[in-house]
Amino acid sequence: KDPREIKDAFLRWRYGITIDDFEAMSDSQGGVCAICGEAPSERHLDVDHDHASGFVRGLLCNDCNRSIGMFGDDPVVIVRAARYLLASAHIQEANQIRSIMAEVLQVHHMLVERMKRIIGDS
């Protein structure tokens, strides 16, 4: 059998879509994962679907498809995870800013002391 026919039969059986539907979704996503935006290097894009209803949501790379599955396909948990990551990024940025400000203050104090010596020597 033709590989395209085999894939079409699988997509119809598993997800209720045709290979033309799959290709239209892929084209609408630019051939990349709907989450990370990366083009799949070794494998094709996976059909992501709601396991309870069977509703096809889009096409994902294998890593993203597995990742949302590990979060139980629960958008609330995924949003919490995103907030957690963003908060830690802000903490890292704040620490970097504090470190830079400490260096700026050191340089400022050195310059003030130099200016005092220069003015005092005049």
Annotate the PLM regions.
Residues 1-46, 51-105, 109, 114:
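Contiguous alpha-helical segments
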